[in-house]
């Protein structure tokens, strides 16, 4: 007889026995005391329904062997939730027939499709549905196996109290799920202790699988997650405590859909139809506890698992975005799981994102005192979820350092990812959630917050209760969100607080603000009371925009300051057309995308508006519609009108008092800022990006001694000077991407040879624009050839070596070539440099290309060796190399490669120290462009 026929006969026999033993002689279709009338009836059960009374429901007993597995029984007052175990490929259940192997109990049925078996776990608590079992000596099991399809085996449940007295021990039951292996499965149930039900997770292996539960005792219970191996897989869970339920289930199907709903109200069992979709789906009805109602919605898509979310009436459940403490969750690349702290009477549900590959998440009961429900949210690959049941009094805190049956690292890293479905997980801002919350596995109360943005921050807290854990999570979110310069919404902050503590949000926010003030010197300020948005401010006072100019955002901040200045000079409002006309004078075109700003139009009308630096309002009664720019609330908080006025005065080479109305308004604003709080601004602790150059030094070359000029720079009209300087700025920005020096002849050829009369004045105008707007300095690279280049002093000071870029091929060789020249005595023969590059693995034709490029970019210069025949050349450092790096950096680079200290080269180290001293002295002098003739 084929396996399919045997399975079909067992299934028909099981249904017949269920109808025979259900009710007191009534047909199953006739409504009775134990038969539900509609789907809302609390007595709806999935599988076989057992009625109230002493009736016994016995599962069909296969004929082929001497012993089978006994489904788990529950002691008096125990509750049992249903769980699913799904595998792909061969499935071996505990059926009586034994064909081969050593003393094993193995089923004869092996299917080629998806097989699922439902196991029941019991825990001490209120009376809930209990699986009816056969009397002592009888052994029954129901496993429906369907070839090339999904197979579901479900145990019947009763409604009120147990219908069958326990037969194994005193009120105990042991359920051994099948062991999944490609060859054979061996499962041996062992005697159990008192009031205990153990559900053992399957072992995944390519060889033989052995699953042996340990004898139950009164010791604390633990759960052993499934293990994966290439050989023999053995899964031995430790002993369990009295009345404690341990359940871990595993799903190993690529496209199967498994959802385990959380527990809800007592005595209520609801069976829900399986979700529809393109793939096989398996469903387990929720076991409802006291005080909650469950709304189940699930959808199924091909290749994805959709979790079931619960809506509790009295006990809310936090969603996946709540940062709960992280313990263990096995994904395709590592281990990470999660436990959420529970308050009294609450039921916690958490969604965990899972990567590709087998993934497991397990939860544990906390000695009759906690209620936790966990559901996985899988991406592509098998997933598993475990659930636990609340007993009496939940603990207020969980130990986040304990490992759950697996070896974890010293610290577990939790990274939040964006939700794929906004209906399942709350929507949050994109692109800023790169951070780590590090927890010490030995000290469960130690949390270290690390920011991974441009501003690295670290904070170690040791919260003693869940309140402090929520404070730590909120603090990390505030620090990372502030780096984006977008206002922080109160609704976003609430998402990072566990749901049962959201009613204490004001206290959590107050504690987080205290940490920000004491540790990071930031003030949490409410930006808009109506929208409940906040920003972080430096406690040292309103921050000038120079202090906010980080390396990537420096040019954008300079552009923003010009816009704010134009708005202020125009009467605190400015039309969009006037703003673009002003920016056009400085080389910023509306439709032209520059690498510095990206899309200027989007930067002004979208990014600065979202960051609340600007307000963008339409003008009423205007056809077609025009817009005006105003100062945004963030600009009023972070800067002052006097600072913006001084900034505009530097750009136009004027004095702030040249605008008397705006100067008086700025003075009044400063007085208003000082009087209410009797507060004076303290200079910002960061070094400003640009050195302020005195007007005497910025004067034209005609005023400079030693540089006479017979042409007056003021002989040209102002509009023509602005037009030529704007064209010059565009030339420098375009040539800066190539890193090639710009000679004076090339500049005059581009802007016109007639500009040689006013060249110094044009150069100084362009230098001021490049300095204040774009954050770069225009410097003389070679005084003899009158070549110029752009230089970012702050960027080069922070860099240990010259960074790589698409326009600088082989920069990894550049630092090595410069270091080689320095070690060789500040000059090296061309043949020696090529031999050095050949030793680094550079191809023959590539060496000449690299050195020629470095020569053209003025990183190295070539000097002819006197009296050499044939002619030979020495390579020395060029002016750009001396500008962008230093001898000390080159020496440190060599020492790092050779794993030595810079002092190991004493002569070069002494020379590098002298070079550093000379650079420090030269850095105190302002860098001014001169027209050297």
From Swiss-Prot:
Residues 719-933 are annotated as: Interaction with DTNA. Pfam families: MAGE. Signal peptide: none annotated. GO terms for cellular component: dendrite; nucleus; perinuclear region of cytoplasm; plasma membrane; postsynaptic membrane. SMART domains: MAGE (SM01373). Keywords: Cell membrane, Cytoplasm, Membrane, Nucleus, Repeat, Tumor antigen, Ubl conjugation pathway. It is found in: Cytoplasm, Perinuclear region; Nucleus; Cell membrane. Residues 1-113, 149-236, 256-282, 360-393 are annotated as: Disordered. Residues 8-23 have a biased composition (Basic residues). GO terms for biological process: negative regulation of transcription by RNA polymerase II. Residues 467-666, 721-912 form the MAGE domain. Disulfide bonds: none annotated. Residues 64-97, 149-166, 173-184, 219-236 have a biased composition (Polar residues). Interacts with DTNA. Interacts with TRIM28. May enhance ubiquitin ligase activity of RING-type zinc finger-containing E3 ubiquitin-protein ligases. Proposed to act through recruitment and/or stabilization of the Ubl-conjugating enzyme (E2) at the E3:substrate complex. This is Melanoma-associated antigen E1. It comes from Rattus norvegicus.
């Amino acid at each position: 007889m084929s396996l399919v026929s045997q399975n079909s006969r067992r299934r028909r026999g099981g249904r017949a026995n269920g109808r025979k033993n259900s009710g007191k002689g009534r047909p199953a279709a006739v409504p009775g005391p134990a038969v539900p009338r509609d789907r809302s009836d609390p007595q709806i059960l999935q599988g076989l329904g057992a009625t109230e009374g002493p009736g016994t429901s016995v599962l069909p007993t296969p004929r082929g062997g001497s012993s089978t597995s006994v489904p788990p029984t529950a002691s008096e007052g125990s509750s049992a939730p249903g769980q699913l175990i799904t595998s792909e490929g061969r499935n071996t259940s505990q059926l009586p027939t034994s064909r081969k192997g050593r003393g094993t109990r193995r089923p004869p049925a092996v299917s080629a499709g998806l097989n699922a078996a439902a196991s029941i776990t019991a825990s001490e608590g209120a009376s809930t549905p209990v699986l009816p079992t056969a009397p002592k000596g009888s052994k029954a099991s129901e496993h429906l196996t369907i070839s090339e399809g999904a197979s579901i085996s479900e145990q019947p449940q009763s409604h009120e109290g147990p219908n069958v007295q326990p037969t194994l021990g005193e009120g105990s039951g042991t359920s051994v799920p099948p062991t999944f292996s490609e060859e054979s499965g061996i499962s041996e149930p062992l005697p159990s202790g008192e009031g205990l039900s153990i559900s053992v997770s399957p072992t995944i292996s390519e060889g033989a699988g052995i699953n042996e539960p340990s004898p139950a005792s009164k010791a604390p219970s633990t759960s052993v997650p499934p293990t994966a191996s290439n050989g023999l897989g053995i899964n031995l869970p430790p002993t369990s405590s009295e009345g404690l339920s341990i359940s871990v289930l595993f799903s190993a199907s690529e496209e199967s859909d498994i959802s385990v709903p959380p527990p809800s109200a007592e005595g209520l069992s609801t069976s829900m139809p399986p979700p529809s979709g393109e793939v096989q789906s398996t469903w387990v009805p929720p076991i409802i506890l006291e005080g909650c109602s469950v709304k189940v919605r699930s959808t199924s898509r091909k290749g994805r698992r959709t979790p079931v979310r619960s809506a509790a009436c009295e006990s809310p459940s936090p969603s996946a975005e709540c940062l709960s403490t992280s313990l263990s969750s096995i994904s395709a690349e590592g281990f990470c799981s999660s436990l959420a702290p529970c308050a009294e009477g609450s039921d916690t549900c958490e969604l965990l994102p899972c990567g590709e590959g087998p993934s497991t998440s397990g939860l544990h009961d906390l000695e009759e005192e906690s209620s936790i429900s966990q559901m996985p949210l899988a991406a592509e690959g098998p997933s598993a979820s475990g659930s636990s049941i609340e007993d009496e009094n939940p603990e207020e805190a969980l130990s986040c350092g304990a490992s759950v049956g697996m070896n974890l690292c010293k610290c577990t890293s939790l990274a939040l990812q964006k939700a794929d479905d906004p209906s399942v997980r709350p929507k949050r801002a994109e692109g800023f959630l790169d951070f780590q919350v590090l927890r010490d596995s030995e000290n469960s109360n130690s949390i270290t917050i690390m920011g991974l943005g441009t501003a690295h921050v670290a904070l170690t807290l040791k919260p003693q209760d869940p309140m402090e854990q929520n404070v730590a999570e909120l603090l990390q979110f505030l620090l990372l969100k502030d780096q984006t310069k977008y206002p922080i919404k109160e609704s976003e902050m609430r998402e990072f607080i566990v749901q049962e503590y959201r009613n204490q949000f004001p206290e959590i926010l107050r504690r987080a603000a205290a940490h920000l003030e004491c540790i990071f010197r930031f003030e949490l300020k409410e930006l808009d009371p109506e929208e409940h948005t906040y920003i972080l401010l430096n406690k040292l006072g309103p921050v000038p925009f120079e202090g906010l100019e980080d390396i990537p955002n420096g040019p954008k901040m300079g552009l923003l300051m010009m816009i704010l200045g134009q708005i202020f000079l125009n009467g605190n409002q400015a039309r969009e057309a006037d703003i673009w006309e002003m920016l056009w004078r400085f080389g910023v075109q509306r439709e032209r995308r520059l690498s510095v700003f990206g899309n200027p139009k989007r930067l002004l009308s979208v990014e600065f508006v979202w960051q609340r630096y600007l307000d963008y309002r339409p003008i009423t009664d205007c056809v077609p519609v025009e817009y005006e720019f105003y100062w945004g609330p963030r600009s009023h908080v972070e800067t002052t009108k006097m600072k913006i006025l001084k900034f505009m005065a530097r750009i136009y080479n004027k004095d702030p008092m040249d605008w008397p109305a705006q100067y008086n308004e700025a003075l009044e604003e400063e007085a208003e800022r000082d009087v209410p709080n009797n507060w004076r601004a303290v200079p910002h602790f960061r070094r400003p990006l640009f050195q302020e150059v005195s007007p005497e030094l910025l004067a034209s070359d005609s005023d400079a001694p030693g540089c006479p000029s017979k042409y007056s720079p003021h002989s040209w009209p102002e509009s023509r000077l602005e037009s030529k300087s704007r064209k010059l700025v565009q030339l420098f920005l375009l040539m800066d991407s190539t890193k090639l020096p710009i000679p004076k002849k090339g500049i005059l050829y581009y802007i016109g040879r007639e500009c040689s009369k006013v060249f110094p004045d044009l150069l100084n105008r362009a230098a001021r624009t490049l300095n204040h707007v774009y954050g770069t300095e225009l410097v003389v690279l070679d005084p003899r050839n009158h070549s110029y280049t752009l230089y970012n002093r702050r960027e080069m000071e922070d860099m240990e070596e010259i960074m790589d870029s698409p326009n600088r091929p082989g920069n990894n060789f550049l630092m090595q070539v410069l270091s080689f020249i320095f070690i060789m005595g500040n000059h090296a023969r061309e043949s020696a440099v090529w031999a050095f590059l050949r030793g680094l693995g550079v191809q023959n034709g590539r060496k000449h290309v690299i050195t020629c490029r470095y020569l053209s970019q003025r990183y190295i210069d070539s000097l002819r060796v006197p009296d050499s025949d044939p002619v030979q050349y020495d390579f020395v450092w060029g002016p750009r190399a001396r500008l962008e790096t230093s001898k000390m950096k080159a020496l440190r680079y060599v020492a790092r490669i050779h794993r030595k200290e810079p002092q190991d080269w004493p002569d070069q180290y002494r020379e590098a120290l002298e070079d550093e001293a000379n650079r420090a002295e030269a850095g105190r002098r302002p860098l001014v462009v001169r027209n050297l003739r």
